Amino acid sequence: MTSTTHPQAAAPAASTSLAGKTVVVVGGKSGIGFGVAQAARAAGATAVVASRRLSSPQERPDLAGFQQVSLDIRDESSVRAAFDAIGVFDHLVVTAAPDLGTWGAFMDADMSGARSYMEGKYLGSWACARHGSPHLNAGGTITFLTGGMAVRPKVGFTAVTSAFAAVEALSGSLAIELAPTRVNTIRPGFIDTDMWAFLPAEHRDGLRKKVEETFPARRAGKPE
């Protein structure tokens, strides 16, 4: 995890309790985002899940009890409208990531795939912070999500590494500019979610096998 909080000597101590707070999770309907939303609700917070499409109770009965709002991270007007609709809140967690598009070695990739991922991951995070922060209550926080590839590049993931590094730089900059709002980035390890569905099955299986052989826990992480 990279912590980029800007120290403020005069800032009051922030409460760690989520009881009675409102937590907005962008990308909160699946994967790590849904795990965050579930944990926030269990801790007594109102959890707002933001995603491109609203789901009916018939489609997603597991979303009962969560507030939903439509937000497309690639569309700044959509992001602005979503936060205007949400109103004041306490904590923002941005976990959303776009589909990678074309996956493979750098020399086999094209600019459209790289642009799509950078727009979704980096500029989407930028837009959420830009239009969400005016609605944050005092003592609020912004948390971004990246991954180990920000500092440990792998073949075939040039766009991901570049976008993750950009988000971490954004986090450091905002920690200074938005202080005393706390801004941090979390780098989770390998979490077995649908995020990896874009990979061919043999590559996914290879990743899981490597995790089981090399990680201390001998297993992949789970969102919860």
Predicted segments — roles?
Residues P61-E76:
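Rossmann-fold cofactor-recognition segment
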Residues A105-M118, Y122-L123, A127, T141-A179, ...:
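Catalytic loop of short-chain dehydrogenase/reductase
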Residues V93, T143-L145, V183-I186, W196:
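Hydrophobic structural elements of the Rossmann-like NAD(P)H-binding subdomain
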Residues K29, A37-Q38:
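N-terminal Rossmann NAD(P)H-binding glycine-rich loop of SDR-like oxidoreductase domains
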Residues F190-P200:
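Short beta-loop-alpha junction of Rossmann-like oxidoreductase domains
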Residues R74-V88:
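Conserved Rossmann-fold cofactor-binding substructure of NAD(P)-dependent oxidoreductases
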Residues V93-W103:
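Conserved NAD(P)H cofactor-binding loop of Rossmann-fold oxidoreductase domains
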Residues T181, T185, R204-E224:
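C-terminal helical subdomain
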